[in-house]
């Protein structure tokens, strides 16, 4: 469930990254697994 990465705009992805980068653990997971996986793991479904 949730939003497929291809459905997100660049601006939406950037805003997710900004939220994730405020959390060191999320930022690390983003580097390993990608922004979609990291954001949903720490913050739940993508709100778009």
Swiss-Prot record:
Q: List the disulfide bonds.
A: 20-26
Q: Name one GO biological process term.
A: cellular response to insulin stimulus
A cellular-component GO term for this protein: extracellular region
Q: Which GO terms describe its molecular function?
A: calcium ion binding; hormone activity; hydroxyapatite binding; structural constituent of bone
Please tell me where Ca(2+) 1 binds in this chain.
Answer: 14
Q: Specify the superkingdom.
A: Eukaryota
Q: Does the keyword Secreted apply?
A: yes
The record ties this protein, via InterPro entries, to: GLA-like_dom_SF (IPR035972), GLA_domain (IPR000294), Osteocalcin (IPR039176)
- Tell me the residue numbers annotated for binding Ca(2+) 2: 18, 21
- Which family does the similarity line name? Belongs to the osteocalcin/matrix Gla protein family.
Q: What is this protein called?
A: Osteocalcin
Give the organism the record lists. Answer: Cyprinus carpio (Common carp)
């Amino acid at each position: 469930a949730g939003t497929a990465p291809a459905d997100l705009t660049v601006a939406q992805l950037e805003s997710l990254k900004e939220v994730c980068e405020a959390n060191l653990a999320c930022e690390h997971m983003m580097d390993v697994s990608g922004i979609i996986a990291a954001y949903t793991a720490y913050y739940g479904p993508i709100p778009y």
